[in-house]
From Swiss-Prot:
Cofactors named for this entry: Zn(2+)
Gene: MDE1
Pathway: Amino-acid biosynthesis; L-methionine biosynthesis via salvage pathway; L-methionine from S-methyl-5-thio-alpha-D-ribose 1-phosphate: step 2/6
Family, similarity comment: Belongs to the aldolase class II family. MtnB subfamily.
Gene3D superfamilies registered for this protein in UniProt: Class II aldolase/adducin N-terminal domain
Upper taxonomic lineage: Eukaryota, Fungi, Dikarya, Ascomycota, Saccharomycotina
Binding positions for Zn(2+) per the UniProt entry: 109, 111, 193
Name assigned to this protein: Methylthioribulose-1-phosphate dehydratase
Binding site for substrate: 91
C-alpha cells in the first residue's frame, strides 16, 4: 500500500470515522485524568471495513492526530499503516484479544485512579449492587426476541481483576483467562494499573467506561464509610463507621 493509500485510511471529514473518534476520545479522557502522561490507549474497529485503528504508544493523548494512528487488518492483524516515528501500542495484544473473544467494536484502556484504588480493595472480582448507574451496563442476557438486556437496579455488577505484569503485552494471557471465566463481563481491572473496557460500538464502549468509572469512584467512597459496595438495601447503616 503506497503512502497516499495509507493516508486515506486515517484522513476523513466524517467526524464518526474511527480516526477522528479516537482523537476526540483521547482528548476527553485526558481531561478526565484517565490517560495522563501518555498512559492508556484506545482502539476502534471500522464498522464497514473491519480495519482496526489503534492509538500509538508514547504519545501524549491530548495531542494525538489521525495521522498518528496505526491501522491493522481486522482479519489477520497485519499492519496496513504504521506511521514513522511512532511505536505500536503495547496494548495491541489485549485489544485484539477483546475483539476475538467478545466481538467488540471498540476497546478502551485507562489508568483511572478509581480503577486502581478498587483493585486494592477487592481480591479477584469487583462487585457493586443496587445502584442506579448499573443499568447503563450490559447483563449478557437477551430477551425472547434476542435483544441484549442491560443490568437491572437489583443486579450485581462483577468485574474480574487480574494481576499486573512488568510489560503490558504480558497481560494478554491473564485477560484472556478472565474473559473465559466471566463470559458476561464488559471490563477487566488490572491491579495497581487500570482497566480495559469494551463495547459493540465506540459509543457503547464510551458509555460503559463512564458508567463503570462512576461506580468505581462510588465504591471507593462507600469503602471509606465502611459500607460494602454490594451491601443489601436497608443494611447500610449497620456498616457505617461512627
Amino acid at each position: 500500500m503506497d503512502a497516499a493509500a495509507q493516508t486515506s485510511l486515517v484522513v476523513s471529514e466524517d467526524r464518526r470515522h474511527p480516526a477522528n473518534v479516537i482523537c476526540a476520545l483521547c482528548r476527553l479522557f485526558y481531561a478526565n485524568n484517565w490517560v495522563t502522561g501518555t498512559g492508556g490507549g484506545i482502539s476502534i474497529k471500522h464498522p464497514a471495513t473491519g480495519h482496526i485503528y489503534i492509538a500509538p504508544s508514547g504519545v501524549q493523548k491530548e495531542q494525538i492526530e489521525p495521522e498518528d494512528l496505526f491501522v491493522l487488518d481486522g482479519v489477520d492483524g497485519a499492519y496496513l499503516r504504521a506511521p514513522a516515528g511512532h511505536r505500536p501500542s503495547a496494548c495491541t495484544p489485549l485489544f485484539l484479544a477483546c475483539y476475538r473473544a467478545r466481538g467488540a467494536g471498540a476497546v478502551i484502556h485507562t489508568h483511572s485512579q478509581h480503577a486502581v484504588l478498587c483493585t486494592l480493595l477487592f481480591d479477584d472480582v469487583f462487585r457493586i449492587a443496587n445502584i442506579e448507574q448499573i443499568k447503563a451496563l450490559p447483563s449478557g442476557r437477551r430477551d425472547a426476541a434476542g435483544k441484549p438486556l442491560s443490568l437491572s437496579f437489583f443486579d450485581t455488577l462483577e468485574i474480574p481483576i487480574i494481576d499486573n505484569t512488568a510489560h503490558e503485552e504480558d497481560l494478554a494471557p491473564g485477560l484472556e483467562a478472565a474473559l473465559a471465566r466471566h463470559p458476561a463481563c464488559t471490563a477487566v481491572l488490572v491491579r495497581r494499573h487500570g482497566i480495559y473496557v469494551w463495547g459493540p460500538t465506540a459509543d457503547r464502549a464510551k458509555v460503559y467506561n463512564e458508567a463503570i468509572d462512576y461506580l468505581l469512584e462510588l465504591a471507593v467512597h462507600m469503602h471509606r464509610l465502611g459500607v460494602p459496595p454490594d451491601c443489601p438495601i436497608g443494611e447500610e447503616k449497620r456498616f457505617l463507621r461512627r
